[in-house]
C-alpha cells in the first residue's frame, strides 16, 4: 500500500530536519545557510561532513515534496513549461553581459548604471533582473537599485561558475531544442554526430562534440569553447555533489606508496592538483587535447615537479606505459557503449600486470526512485545531458561491469565504492596480464 503523504506530515519532517541540520552546522562551527551575499557558495565537503550532507539531502527532499504537493498536479507542470525557459533566458543575459561584476558585493547600483554599461535600455534591464530576483538572483534593496544575494554573489566568489553556466546555456540549451527532432530521425544511433547537439550545430559525419569545441573560432580565438569547458569543469569538480573529494576516500591512494597516476582526459588538471596536495608520494600525468596544454601553467609552483601534461587522443592507444593507476574521472559517461569499450581497450597496450584502472563516474539506479528523489534528479540531469550532448547512455552498475568485460577479459572489477554525500562512484579495476 502506498503511504499517504500529507502537508502536515511533510511540514513536521521539514521542521525536524531543519533543526537537525542547524544543530550539526553549529556543532561543526559552520555558518547557517543564508540568502545574503556572504553566504558560503557551496556546502561543506569531505568525510567529516557526511552527517551534514545526509541531513541536507533529507531536508531538500522534504522541502521539494511539500512545495510540489502545495502546487498541485497542473501547477507542477506549468511551473516548468511557463517559467523555466524564461529563468534560463534571464540567467543567460546575466552571465553573457557579466552583470554580477557590475554590482558591488556589499553595496548597490542603479538599473540605469547597469543599462549604461551593458548597452541596452534600462527598462529591459529592469524586466530581466526583476524576473531573476524571483529565483533569488539579486535583490532590490530600494526602488531603482540592485544588490547581491548569495546566488548572484557566487559568480564573484567562484569566477569559473560563469564558464559552467555559459557552456550550459550557449550549447546544452540549444541542443535540448533539437532533442525531439533527433529522436525522430536517429534515435537508435550510437554515433556522436547523431546527437542533439550535433544536429543543433551541424556536425559533419564522424565528428564529435570534442572536435567541435577544439576547432570552433578563428586565429587566437580558435578553441575558445574548449577553454571555457575546461574552466567550467573546474567549477563542477569543486562543487557538490560530484566533488573531487569523493576520490580521496573511495580508493587507497596512500597505499600505493610512490606511484604514477595517469589522469586520462584530465582537462585542466584540477583533479590531479587536489590529489597531489593530499598524497605527496604520487606523481601525475594529465592527458588531454593539445589545446589544453597551456593550462599546465596554472598548476601551483610547489606541485609542478609532480604534475605534467601529455597530449593524448583517448580514441587512440594510450602512449604512456607502465603507470600504476589510470584514472578516468567523468570520461566514459561522455561516450556510447561502443566508444566506452574502445577507450578501455586503448588502455590495454600501456598496462602492466596489476595496474589499476579507476572509473570515477555516475552509476544509475537499477530501478527508478530507488533513493531520495533529489539525489536521483542529479543523476537523471546528468543522464539527459549525456544523451543530448554526446549520445551516451546512463549506466547502472550492471551496465558498467558489462562495458568493462566487453573491453578485455583481463580486466577484473575489484570494488565499486560510492562515498556518502556524493552522486559519484568509483569502480576499481585490476588488470591481470596473465588471465
From Swiss-Prot:
Q: Which GO terms describe its molecular function?
A: O-methyltransferase activity
User: In what pathway does it function?
Assistant: Secondary metabolite biosynthesis
Entry keywords, A to Z = Methyltransferase, S-adenosyl-L-methionine, Transferase
InterPro entries noted in UniProt: COMT-like (IPR016461), O_MeTrfase_dom (IPR001077), SAM-dependent_MTases_sf (IPR029063), WH-like_DNA-bd_sf (IPR036388), WH_DNA-bd_sf (IPR036390)
Its GO biological process annotations read: methylation; secondary metabolite biosynthetic process
The record's function comment reads: O-methyltransferase; part of the gene cluster that mediates the biosynthesis of azaterrilone A and other azaphilones, a class of fungal metabolites characterized by a highly oxygenated pyrano-quinone bicyclic core and exhibiting a broad range of bioactivities. The first step of the pathway begins with the non-reducing polyketide synthase tazA that assembles one acetyl-CoA starter unit, five malonyl-CoA units, and catalyzes a series of Claisen condensations, methylation, PT-mediated cyclization, and finally releases the first hexaketide precursor through the R-domain.
Name the record gives this protein: O-methyltransferase tazO
- State the organism of origin: Aspergillus terreus (strain NIH 2624 / FGSC A1156)
Q: What is the lineage of its organism?
A: Eukaryota, Fungi, Dikarya, Ascomycota, Pezizomycotina
Amino acid at each position: 500500500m502506498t503511504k499517504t503523504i500529507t502537508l502536515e506530515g511533510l511540514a513536521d519532517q521539514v521542521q525536524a530536519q531543519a533543526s537537525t541540520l542547524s544543530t550539526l552546522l553549529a556543532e561543526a562551527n559552520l555558518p547557517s545557510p543564508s540568502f545574503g551575499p556572504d553566504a558560503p557558495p557551496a556546502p561543506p565537503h569531505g568525510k567529516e561532513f557526511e552527517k551534514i550532507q545526509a541531513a541536507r539531502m533529507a531536508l531538500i527532499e522534504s522541502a521539494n515534496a511539500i512545495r510540489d504537493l502545495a502546487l498541485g498536479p497542473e501547477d507542477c507542470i506549468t511551473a516548468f513549461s511557463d517559467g523555466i525557459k524564461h529563468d534560463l533566458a534571464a540567467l543567460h543575459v546575466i552571465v553573457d553581459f557579466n552583470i554580477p561584476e557590475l554590482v558591488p558585493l556589499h553595496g548597490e547600483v542603479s538599473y540605469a548604471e547597469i543599462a549604461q554599461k551593458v548597452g541596452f535600455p534600462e527598462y529591459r534591464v529592469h524586466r530581466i533582473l526583476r524576473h531573476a530576483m524571483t529565483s533569488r538572483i539579486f535583490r532590490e534593496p530600494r526602488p531603482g537599485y540592485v544588490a547581491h544575494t548569495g546566488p548572484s554573489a557566487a559568480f564573484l566568489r567562484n569566477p569559473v561558475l560563469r564558464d559552467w553556466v555559459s557552456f550550459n546555456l550557449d550549447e546544452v540549451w540549444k541542443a535540448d531544442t533539437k532533442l525531439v527532432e533527433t529522436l525522430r530521425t536517429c534515435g537508435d544511433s550510437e554515433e556522436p554526430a547523431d546527437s542533439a547537439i550535433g544536429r543543433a550545430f551541424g556536425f559533419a559525419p564522424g565528428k564529435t562534440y570534442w572536435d567541435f569545441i577544439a576547432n570552433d573560432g578563428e586565429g587566437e580565438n580558435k578553441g575558445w569553447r574548449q577553454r571555457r569547458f575546461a574552466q567550467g569543469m573546474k567549477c563542477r569538480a569543486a562543487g557538490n555533489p560530484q566533488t573531487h573529494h569523493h576520490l580521496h576516500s573511495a580508493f587507497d591512494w596512500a597505499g600505493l606508496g610512490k606511484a604514477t597516476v595517469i589522469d586520462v582526459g584530465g582537462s585542466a588538471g584540477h583533479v590531479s592538483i587536489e590529489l597531489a596536495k593530499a598524497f605527496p608520494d604520487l606523481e601525475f600525468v594529465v592527458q588531454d587535447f593539445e589545446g589544453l596544454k597551456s593550462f599546465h601553467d596554472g598548476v601551483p609552483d610547489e606541485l609542478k615537479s609532480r604534475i605534467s601534461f601529455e597530449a593524448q587522443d583517448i580514441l587512440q592507444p594510450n602512449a604512456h606505459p607502465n603507470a600504476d593507476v589510470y584514472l578516468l574521472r567523468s570520461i566514459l559517461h561522455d561516450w556510447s557503449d561502443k566508444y566506452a569499450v574502445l577507450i578501455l581497450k586503448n588502455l590495454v597496450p600501456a598496462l602492466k600486470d596489476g595496474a589499476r584502472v579507476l572509473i570515477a563516474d555516475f552509476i544509475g539506479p537499477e530501478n527508478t526512485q530507488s533513493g531520495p528523489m533529489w539525489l536521483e534528479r542529479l543523476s537523471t540531469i546528468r543522464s539527459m545531458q549525456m544523451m543530448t550532448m554526446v549520445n551516451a547512455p546512463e549506466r547502472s552498475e550492471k551496465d558498467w561491469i558489462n562495458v568493462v568485460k566487453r573491453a578485455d577479459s583481463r580486466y577484473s572489477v575489484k570494488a565499486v565504492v560510492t562515498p556518502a554525500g556524493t552522486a559519484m562512484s568509483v569502480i576499481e579495476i585490476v588488470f591481470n596480464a596473465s588471465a
